[in-house]
């Protein structure tokens, strides 16, 4: 009886040991899979984003003046953006067309597509708009409503971050996937607040609408997209925009985790934001590429939930913060270099 009990105990010990080993292998397998899928959780990766460089790129765009549609400043800045991307080894495709504004105005438009390793797959899409709003229609002074916006934040900042990422990609030349940077035109020619009619609802993001319906390459696809809108403002914090969560919630999770890993969780808050009509909508609904919008939310700002300078004459370099540029740029780099 004693031997039988001892044998039974020994068998039980072996059974439990084998079960433990099996569970350990399963756990390791799951951990390995989780690490692969959510590798942004592990540690900072990729080159250091240079906020001073991004700030300079922002300034250089503003030096042309407001880049409003059909203006000389717009045309000159277009050439500068193309040349800057080319100088960093990007293959550039200018997608030119004539769009129609809400008021019937023909708008000479150029979407600028700059590709890192254009023949490589998979691809990631990073985008921003580069035009300036023609009217400061949210300015507290009504006398400024028909003046153009310099668009240091609402335009130049997103392009500046993309240019600095492109420069960093060329410098390290180790990213094992392709990246397409798209500068969308005619985003900010939307229906002004001082108009008395009814906004038809599709007057914004005209360049993105055109690109989504007329892809720069037949059959173009990307694993996902990230839109950078107003990513240089003072006091900016980025909430999780609701339509981004609807169309690409897994990408929202990925980007916000990446921000936490690189130390910018105080900029990327785990809070729900409102839904925004922006360039990411046609990318999602027409091009069928899951795309999120990194856009600030100021819940306590009386002037606008987009911040105090939005669509005002004060959207200038005096209100650009290198810390915000750094937080966004380093987060996007973390996302890119975490991909497998």
What are these model-predicted stretches?
Residues 24-27:
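C-terminal motif of bacterial Sec signal peptides marking the signal peptidase cleavage site
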Residues 33-78, 88, 302-319:
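N-terminal capping segment at the start of a domain
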Residues 40-48, 63-72, 99-102, 144-156, ...:
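Second-shell loop/turn segments in exported
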Residues 56-119:
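A non-catalytic alpha/beta surface segment that caps or lines the substrate-entry region
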Residues 67-69, 98-101, 118-120, 130-134, ...:
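Solvent-exposed loop/turn segments at secondary-structure junctions
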Residues 96, 106, 224, 231-340:
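Active-site-adjacent substrate-binding region
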Residues 146-247, 275, 279:
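Acidic/histidine-rich catalytic neighborhood of metal-dependent amide-processing enzymes
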